[in-house]
Amino acid sequence: MISEIGKAAVAEMGILLARFREDHNKLWLIGTATCETYLRCQVYHSTMENDWDLQAVPIASRSPHPGIFPRLGNERILGSSMEPLNPLKSFTGSVPVLSSRGPGNLNPRLRKSCCPQCTEKFEQELAKLVSEFANQSSEDKSESPRPQLPQWLQNAKLNNDSKVTALSQSKDQALLQQKTQELQKKWNDTCLQLHPNFQQNIGPERTVSPALCMPGLYNPNLLLRQPLQPKLQPSKNLGVSLQLNTTQMASKPQEKAASPPGSPVRTDLVLGPKQTETTPEKTLEDQAKDFLSRISSVPQNKFLDKFASALDADTFKRLLKGLMEKAWWQQDAASSVASAVSRCRLGNGRQRGGAPKGDIWLLFSGPDRFAKRKMASVLAEQFCGNSPIMICLGSRRDDEESDLGFRGKTALDRIAEAVRRNPVSVIMLEDIDEANVLIRGSIKRAMDRGKLTDSHGREISLGNVIFILTGNWSTMSPESYRNEYLMEEKKLVSLASSNWQLRLSLGEKSAKRRASWLHDEDRPTRPRKELNLGLAFDLNEAADVEDYRTDGSHNSSDLTVDHEEEPGLENRRFAIASVPHDLVSSVDDTIPFKLIEFSFARREIKKTISKKFSMVVDDKVSIEVEDDIVDRILGGLWRGQTSLEQWVEKVLGPSFDQLQPRLSTLDENAVVRLQLELYTALKGQSNGECLPSKVTIVADGQVMSTTS
């Protein structure tokens, strides 16, 4: 709409100019516009300047002084009496040229801080620098031939040029001042390295502040020396840095030492209240102790080591607590992950090409992929404040969602894109044992070089990314046990994926058969076998018969408590030899994950629920949890992101509180049962969680309420 109006206005103005030109009349139009508006007009109306015979004149940002422009004259638009304030031809000034020695504008400490040789070389370079600035200024001010302009345009242009020239002159002066200070600092450092003896001789004199007698290039910083304060950084190099700082502080000459007898200066000029010194000079050890809060009983190096260890312990405890809350059935793996990450984050001497290494590579090997994901989520939440990035290098599983945004991209492209978007993140590369040779080779080179190359040949630095490689390298024997474990895993996943809700009901205690997983774990003492004393013993019987006992036990003793390991348990341990050697040698640490002890997990679930119930309700009333409910809760905890304690506190806790007043009137035979709610096909879990968020309370066959 605006473009059409502009085109119409331009066309009408062109017609008006053409009409006046036919009668040999003159039409003057004066208008103002911003630079952006004028450029936009040139883009949309390229022939506007020729059609209107426009002559663009820049206008200064600040209005001129009153009285400069007189009233309109008869001969010219602005009259002929106005003269340029600062004619361009009469402007011959440039950046003030400093003298070759420059004693007035130089830092007066230079002569004391540099030897005569370095001072002479500094003055030579300074003279050369000043001459270069003068030549550059004269070249910039040389005028190029311009077409003749009307007098009023020349006056406006000269006024604008004078202001631009003054601005450029001030910029040149500031730039020359900066270059001079940099040159002075350069020769101070050079003299300190080449002539250390001269610096030591003038050391006591350098602490005296010179009198600032004349303004110039010299602009000293604060005269007071800033107090040395340690910066607490979570790094194992903290102790070393503190020791270096205290050593440098103590190795400096005594600044407040008495002046020599022949010195005319006998006072120290400082800003602030003067501190009275009544104690003698302290030794290096005493100064270090004062710096570390007056520690007298513990040596300095031991305190620094203990301080760094305290930072390590704090990081380790916080991380271990988060890992144990989310994956409490993998206690050994959680402890190993916390130790490895804390050690890598604090340096641990990890270097790549002589520089500290920022990225971290961990290898999670073994089964239980859901526990690996939970630990990756804890790492991302505590160190990065976001969720981990999951990239599958193998075949996609049924329970995983496909990301349409990465369709058509290789795994390396997805990794590079994730690093490019967020260089401080946690990236989990799942199923690296199923990746092809090219992907594994590229990841191996990224570990060694610290840069990842995508499919287009572009390299990207890994930054401070925590990479987690996962693989199912483990040995499970016999094969029947492996199949049994996989079936149990699929069962839990299936139960957790279905829609289900919970119900709390009141009833009386009844004899109930113990769960099968309780019989397996809490077996009684093995009874003595009935031995047939009349049975002949054949010494020629084959000695390699493996199972010669009737009960199928590998224990040859008949009088033992049943604490022997279950068949195949010794083969469930992670075998490090099965992992490729190139991955083990390249990653920062390898963490083995064990098979899930389902019986242990079930016991922990019942124990946690019973503990919460006993805290709310009287001990005379007990709670019973059905076996099917325990399996469903285990599957939901395994797949979801909620921890067991959080779910019990948030969902079951309010239900127990609501049930507590009614239980106070019941006898000891009363029992509360946690059961599966029937007819819940239309009810689902909230927020995509695998655990129910509501509990229905039923008493005497009637629904009391539903809590959430």
Swiss-Prot record:
Instruction: Using the UniProt annotation, give all residue ranges assigned to the region (Disordered).
Output: 248-283
GO-annotated molecular function = ATP binding; ATP hydrolysis activity
Could you list this entry's UniProt keywords, alphabetically sorted: Hydrolase, Repeat, Transcription, Transcription regulation
**Motif range (EAR):** 537-541
Q: Which Gene3D superfamilies match?
A: P-loop containing nucleotide triphosphate hydrolases (3.40.50.300)
InterPro entries referenced in this protein's UniProt entry, alphabetically: ATPase_AAA_core, P-loop_NTPase, SL_signaling_regulator
| SUPFAM superfamilies according to UniProt | P-loop containing nucleoside triphosphate hydrolases
In the induction comment, the record states: Targeted to degradation in stigma upon (-)-germacrene D perception by KAI2IA, probably through the formation of an E3 SCF ubiquitin ligase complex (ASK-cullin-F-box) containing MAX2A or MAX2B and KAI2IA recognizing SMAX1A.
* Record PANTHER family: CHAPERONE PROTEIN CLPD, CHLOROPLASTIC (PTHR43572), PROTEIN SUPPRESSOR OF MAX2 1 (PTHR43572:SF13)
Q: Give the family, as the similarity comment puts it.
A: Belongs to the ClpA/ClpB family.
Q: What does this protein do?
A: Probable component of a transcriptional corepressor complex that acts downstream of MAX2 to negatively regulate karrikins/strigolactone responses. Involved in the (-)-germacrene D signaling pathway influencing plant fitness and occurring in the stigma in a KAI2IA-dependent manner.
Please state what the protein is called.
Protein SUPPRESSOR OF MAX2 1A
Q: Which organism is it from?
A: Petunia hybrida
Gene name, per UniProt, is: SMAX1A
